[in-house]
Amino acid sequence: MRKYIQGAFRQFCFLMIAPLLIAFAGPAAFAQLTKVGKGEGRVDIVAWPGYIERGETMKEFDWVTKFEEATGCMVKVKTANTSDEMVALMNEGGFDLVTASGDASLRLIAGKRVQPINTSLIPSWSTVDERLKNAPWHTVNGVHYGTPYMWGPNVLMYNKNVFGDKPPTSWNVVFEPMNLPDGKPNEGRVQAYDGPIHVADAANYLMYHKPELGIKSPYELNQEQYADALDLLRQQRKLVSRYWHDAFIQMDDFKNEGMVASGSWPFQVNLLASEKQPVASVIPVEGATGWADTTMMHADSEHPNCAYMWMEHSLASNLQSDLSVWFGANPAVPAACTDGRGMQTAEGCTLNGLDDFEKIKFWTTPVSRCKSQDECVPYYRWVSDYIGVIGGR
């Protein structure tokens, strides 16, 4: 209880900056670097867990040490478990870069917390997947606010001992009360994500099972569609034992606390499988939401030269290749799948869903002025109402 109340409090604090979501006036004026100079000796990065490794978790996964040796820029990482936490940290300041998902990136741009980047200072920009170069979650009015980093789906992780030879095919195992294949109820044995963006997972489920609602995008909901999504989440609340936002706590819950099904990231699935835990994952028939993360530079970066050096380094195909294996996700640089510079292979990228880009409903920030209908429920409502759902209201 304490953990998800703390998460709700962080999300409530975000309401203070919610007006930024209502409109975006256009890119602010920033003095872009015209050349990369000598490094300042340090770069401070806000990142998702597992995104920036220096061999401390597993020694073969290290893309920090050689960068530090080559540039003299010491990498300091602050992990964040939700997009709202990332936005809050960037608002506080003191960081150079952030690996932001689409439900954070546009907020950071609108709030002028990140600056446009000069792609001519990033030689590896030309190697970026064409599907990502002009993606709307980091490109506004033709201006780029970051370099793509990694992308992938939110998967349904499950316990193989519980599901046996009947792996789940639908998200209903975490949304609807039922007995699982082991004959026991799912109540108290499933989890849900501790973040308002989980409303989109409910909407995605309804897109498939209630087509009469007319949902075109899980991030663009009118009042009726939104109300149905909240009702589904309230039903789910009765089933959920814990709302997760810490990847490592979720892994412990699957190992030691009897959790058997939850939305998750490939990162947790891969680590648990490496520990010989009986877990696997699927993308169910309803499809999945997902994330495409961008390395963005703080508007007040104190170490801009090191920041640009890191953005270039982050697109190296060997780093992209190893990160793709480590996180179970897809590289922003397609050559990372085939050039043999890292651990990843073409088969591995296919397994991670490289060809499923069009099937994933990528996280983005819900706004009132939406494309699919006249008016949609904006994100600040998602924040306040999801706090209510978690609190049992």
Label for each model-derived stretch:
Residues 48, 52-59, 99-249:
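Extracytoplasmic ligand-binding site segments that recognize negatively charged/polar headgroups
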Residues 359-393:
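Conserved C-terminal helix/tail region of periplasmic/extracytoplasmic solute-binding proteins
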Residues 104-107, 263-278:
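A ligand-binding cleft/hinge motif common to bilobed small-molecule-binding domains
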Residues 127, 227-236, 275-296, 345:
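Periplasmic-binding protein-like
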